[in-house]
């Protein structure tokens, strides 16, 4: 019984430290917001080209890799961060609220310039 108790304690401690390490590896909220704003902008630009689906997908992947490189983010870091924020829905809601606000502001500025 004592052995099982200590084994349980060790598992709990290791899982907590693993979670903390994961949290240290994820992108900060502001980094995530900036990245997602740019990513959605790229996605919109690719869709507006009206290319065949396979060509659009290839172009999007290339542009996404360029964005990752430009922002100095590894793809695994982005995907891990995105997954982490999906598990923390209140934070993801705040992130996407900021993304939508930023994209709306960009859109209104572009419309003003076009007028």
Regions found by a protein language model. Give the residues of each.
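Post-signal peptide N-terminal segment of mature Sec-exported envelope proteins
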Residues: 25-46
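Bacterial signal peptide processing site
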Residues: 17-19
């Amino acid at each position: 019984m004592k052995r099982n108790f200590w084994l349980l304690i060790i598992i709990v401690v290791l899982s907590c430290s693993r979670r903390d390490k994961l949290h240290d590896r994820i992108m900060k909220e502001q980094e995530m917001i900036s990245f997602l704003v740019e990513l959605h902008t790229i996605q919109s630009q690719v869709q507006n080209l009206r290319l065949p689906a396979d060509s659009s997908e290839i172009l999007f992947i290339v542009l996404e890799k360029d964005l990752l490189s430009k922002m100095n983010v590894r793809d695994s870091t982005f995907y891990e961060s995105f997954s982490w924020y999906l598990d923390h829905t209140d934070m993801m809601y705040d992130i996407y609220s900021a993304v939508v606000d930023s994209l709306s502001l960009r859109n209104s500025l572009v419309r003003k310039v076009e007028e």
